[in-house]
Amino acid sequence: MATAWESEYFDKVTPGERERAVPPMVPQQTPPPVYIQPQVSRNGIVASIVLRLLTLIFAVVALAVLASNTGSFQVSTGSATSVKTIKFTILSAFTYLFAVCGVVAVYSLLLIIVEMIDLAVRGFTTHTLVAIFVFVLDQTMAYVLISAASASANGVKVSRDESNITGYKFDISCSNLGIDDYCTKASASVAIAFIAFLFMAITAGVSARRLFKLP
């Protein structure tokens, strides 16, 4: 005789029907890190964008000042007198600074776009490989920019001294050529490049902090 607990009134299965097996619960998979909500605060991303924007502005200004820097002087050869014009390309250090400022400006613009997208959709720059890539590039850009600015600072010193900056066989400088404006604008572009480096270095520090805070 069946007990009450074994009767059909206490069973959830209809008499004659086999008990259905309950499927095992499948554990929910953890999404890959790229889709995890970033732990970096929104303020950190905004600060990085602002710093990159400042770097971009100062790099473009330094590039523009350097590109527009020219000087004219007269050269007498016998009875003939000719007017010569020099540009920033007269010294390789200035050409180097011009190229570096252009690269830093383009790089900063690209990273601003990337981080603005990241600010909207979140999660892209928090991927470990991307964060490492950005960190390495920030460090590289800061190093290259400070090396170019330092070399150009020495170029300004050479231009102001009694040194050959025009390619002629005799020593001529900004002072005795009457092109002091040339050296002044060159000094201004170098100073602006140093300011751009300052913001680039701070940006590199921010990217390093974001990298080390990733899980």
Swiss-Prot record:
Taken from the record's topology, the Cytoplasmic segments are: 1-44, 115-128, 207-215
Protein's name according to its UniProt entry: CASP-like protein UU3
* InterPro entries xref list: CASP/CASPL (IPR006459), CASP_dom (IPR006702)
Lineage of the species this protein comes from: Eukaryota, Viridiplantae, Streptophyta, Embryophyta, Bryophyta
Organism encoding this protein: Physcomitrium patens (Spreading-leaved earth moss)
Q: Topology with regard to the membrane?
A: Multi-pass membrane protein
Record's Pfam families? CASP_dom
The primary location reported for this protein is: membrane
Subunit structure, interactors included = Homodimer and heterodimers.
Q: Which family does it belong to?
A: Belongs to the Casparian strip membrane proteins (CASP) family.
Task: Enumerate the glycosylated residues.
Answer: N164
Record keywords: Cell membrane, Glycoprotein, Membrane, Transmembrane, Transmembrane helix
**Where does it live in the cell?**
Cell membrane
Q: Which residues lie on this side of the membrane: Extracellular?
A: 66-93, 150-185
A cellular component term from Gene Ontology for this protein is: plasma membrane
Which residue windows are transmembrane per the record?
45-65, 94-114, 129-149, 186-206
The keyword Transcription is assigned to this record: no
